[in-house]
Structures are given as structure tokens and as C-alpha cells.
A protein has these predicted regions:
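N-terminal secretory signal peptides
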Residues: 1-42
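Sequence context surrounding c-type heme c attachment/ligation sites in exported
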Residues: 13, 37-135
Length: 135
């Protein structure tokens, strides 16, 4: 996504993520979404870039930094194409360092319903976990 802007960064137990959104979704984020009962417009897109992480050994304080690229995840809203998942489609691509290519992950091979199942926890936020932090 060449026109993606940074929404936020996050860290799980196994990865650091950069979360980017296209201009349609960024406009919605800046207007206050995800908010209770408000929906992202069709055409909204998110890309998440996952890296493993390591401790920066030269920093004077404890900080984790990106290490190896792990995967890319894509989320797109199109209520006509994806009615079974409230308009959201999910795709996940695992990075293969040996071939320097991406391949569909287990999540992608399971279909949009698999990504949707996880996101039902935030249905009140139109199925999007990450908010747009103040800046």
C-alpha cells in the first residue's frame, strides 16, 4: 500500500507490528473511529507488518527493536463482497526468508472467516482492534 499512513505500532509476546491504513481509513480514524456504533466506510484498508524483535544491546535503556520480517496481514472493508464477515476480508502472508518471498499463511488458507472470528471480540468497534492514538 503505497499511500498507507501509520495508525499505530504494537507489540505482542512474539512480534512488533506497524499498522498502516489507506487514506479512506485514515480519514475515518481521524474522525474518531473506531467508536461505539460507528462503521468504517467501504474501501477502508489496513496493512500490518510483523517483525520478530530483539533487545537493542547498545541502547542505554531497555528497548526492543524489529529483527526479522515475519508476515504481512491485510484487512479490507467491502460490504458487498464480504457480507458474511460484516464487510471485512482478511489475508495473512508469511515471509519465507530462504526464498525472500511471501506465501499464504495458515490463516489465509482458512479464509476470511478465520480472521473474522478473532475480530468478533471488537464488534462494537467495527471489528478493528487498534485505535488511532492522539498525536
Amino acid at each position: 500500500m503505497k499511500t498507507g499512513k501509520t495508525v499505530a505500532v504494537s507489540q505482542t509476546e512474539t512480534a512488533i507490528k506497524a499498522i498502516l491504513a489507506n487514506p479512506i481509513m485514515m480519514t475515518a480514524f481521524r474522525s474518531g473511529l473506531p467508536a461505539e456504533g460507528k462503521l468504517f466506510p467501504d474501501g477502508s484498508k489496513v496493512v500490518k507488518i510483523f517483525w520478530s524483535f530483539k533487545k537493542n544491546e547498545v541502547s542505554p535503556y531497555s528497548v526492543n527493536v524489529p529483527d526479522a520480517l515475519k508476515e504481512l496481514a491485510f484487512i479490507e472493508k467491502d460490504t458487498k463482497r464480504f457480507p458474511n464477515t460484516h464487510g471485512w476480508a482478511y489475508a495473512d502472508w508469511a515471509y519465507d526468508a530462504a526464498t525472500d518471498t511471501f506465501k499464504p499463511s495458515q490463516l489465509s488458507q482458512s479464509g476470511a472467516e478465520c480472521g473474522y472470528a478473532c475480530h468478533t471480540k471488537v464488534s462494537a468497534q467495527d471489528y478493528i482492534f487498534t485505535a488511532y492514538p492522539k498525536r
